[in-house]
Amino acid sequence: MTDNELIILNYIKNRCRGKQHAETFGRLSLLLGINERELRLCVAELVTHWQQPIASTSDAGYYWLNCDDEYQQASNELMSRIRKLSMRHKGLRLGYMKSKQVITKQLVML
């Protein structure tokens, strides 16, 4: 675990227990002196690689999961994001395929 990951983990684990104590990434960045990009990458690594129960919401920020209800809410929000990204990916793929067909038709007409 990196120094920044340890700093973030200790802060969230001790000061952000439960959704009611969540901190936005902007405020955490200021409090911990870690730029926002690095903060996001570290939190992702803490959850993904180190399996730490750190949740995030688009409005409240980052927090340490404190109960089953918070886990369920965090899980539902992640699944919602996954579905939206999947739909975006599908739109991108279909749009690209359509644009290739238009170009092919234009070339045939020449």
What does each model-identified segment do?
Residues T24-L31:
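A short acidic, leucine-rich amphipathic alpha-helix
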Residues M1-Y11:
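Short alpha-helical segments that sit at the start of domains
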Residues V47-S58:
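A short, conserved structural fragment
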Residues S58-N66:
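Minor-groove-contacting beta-hairpin "wing" of winged helix-turn-helix DNA-binding domains
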Residues D68-S75:
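Short, charged/polar, Gly/Pro-enriched secondary-structure boundary elements
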Residues N14-Q20, H49:
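Short helix-capping/hinge SLiMs at alpha-helix to coil transitions
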